[in-house]
Amino acid sequence: YISIPSASAVPRAVFEAVGGFPEGMKIGGDMYMWIKIARRYAVCFSPKPLANYSKVASNRSALSYTPERTRYSFEELYDPSAPEEYNEFVARAALGKALIISAKGGTKEAARAAEFFGYTKTYRRTLRKVRVLNALPRSWRAPLIGLYNSLAWRIARKGL
């Protein structure tokens, strides 16, 4: 990740220069803004843990979904003249968002992201997950992705 929002220090002038958070974008707005910041400014990373992240914290915004009404899209962050790593990171952010949107029933939006960001070489697994999830009945998607994430989290913590 470019930035974990709870552990970021960004001057107000930088937020203002990149236009702040994208108005109307409910999912991925923070990542959208971090990408815009990293495109224009130097970003420093410290491997030292400076914040804790809780996987069990409640996320009220995840409880309901209504389609976004925004003029902003990760597609506009794609830059054919940028280094491959940059566009791969944009694809990663967009496909992660597409997974959430598909799980919540946004079939068309997720399919559009899968088509546009199908160029990814690094995040083929995420691309396949979006396509598979999108092919399932809507009522199956959220429980299935929840089960997948739960199992992946347990395996990562305890190993096989």
Q: Where do the PLM segments sit?
A:
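Conserved nucleotide-sugar donor-binding catalytic segment
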Residues: Y1-P67
